[in-house]
């Protein structure tokens, strides 16, 4: 098989893995269409709020795992840093724009964390810690998600990850921030819903 076919197949696989709407499927098992409740976002946070903590944790774990698997397969199949970084980014895009849900997906936070864990484990854990600190200090999951995403990119630079990785992580953070643009508007207006608040 020509090398470019391998690259194309791996990227297509990364997109399709990212596209698997685990949050939607987990919520459906609980009898809920997550697209029609809460924020309407197909992500673990909305599953947690709309279905329950256990369902939210399962959705997060599966979204995280599919990102990690997409990157791991690229690392094992092609190797290097550039191509797996691209696969990580494609997996995030797959989650945000899944073919199975007419390209209306989630915001990419859990999938992004999973996708960059094999490439930059320390930076990813630092980003996740940043999310936890900000989210629990402010009770804004959206703010924690945005800060955590950008901190992953910053820490990847600071920890000396191979050059494509920090740039890909930063690109993913920009995409995640864009998907949170309505949350950002509400944060600025003081109307964003806090964690644990009633709908």
Language model feature labels by segment:
Residues 162-172, 183, 194:
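C-terminal binding/interaction regions
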Residues 1-12, 65, 69-86, 117-123, ...:
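Helix-coil boundary and interhelical linker segments in multi-pass alpha-helical membrane proteins
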Residues 48-51, 74-77, 90, 94, ...:
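Interfacial segments of multi-pass membrane proteins
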Residues 4-12, 56-57, 61, 84-89, ...:
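Hydrophobic alpha-helical transmembrane segments
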Residues 13, 17-68, 96-110, 136-147, ...:
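Interhelical loop and helix-boundary elements at the membrane-water interface
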Residues 69-109:
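Helix-adjacent hinge/juxtasegments
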Residues 9, 13, 72-73, 133-137, ...:
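Residue-level signal for alpha-helical transmembrane segments in multi-pass membrane proteins
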């Amino acid at each position: 098989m020509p090398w470019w076919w391998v690259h194309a197949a791996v990227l297509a696989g990364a997109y399709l893995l990212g596209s698997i709407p685990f949050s939607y499927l987990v919520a459906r098992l609980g009898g809920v269409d997550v697209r029609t409740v809460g924020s309407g976002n197909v992500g673990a946070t909305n599953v947690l709020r709309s279905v329950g903590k256990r369902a939210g944790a399962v959705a997060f774990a599966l979204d995280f795992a599919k990102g990690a698997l997409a990157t791991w397969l690229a690392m094992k199949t092609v190797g290097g840093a550039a191509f797996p970084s691209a696969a990580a980014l494609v997996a995030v895009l797959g989650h945000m724009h899944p073919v199975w849900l007419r390209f209306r997906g989630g915001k990419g936070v859990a999938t992004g964390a999973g996708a960059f864990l094999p490439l930059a484990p320390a930076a990813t854990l630092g980003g996740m810690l940043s999310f936890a600190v900000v989210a629990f200090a402010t009770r804004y999951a959206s703010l924690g998600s945005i800060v955590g995403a950008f901190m992953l990119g910053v820490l990847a630079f600071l920890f000396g990850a191979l050059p494509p990785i920090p740039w890909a992580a930063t690109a993913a953070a920009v995409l995640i921030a864009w998907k949170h643009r309505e949350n950002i508007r509400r944060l600025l207006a003081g109307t964003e819903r806090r964690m644990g608040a009633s709908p």
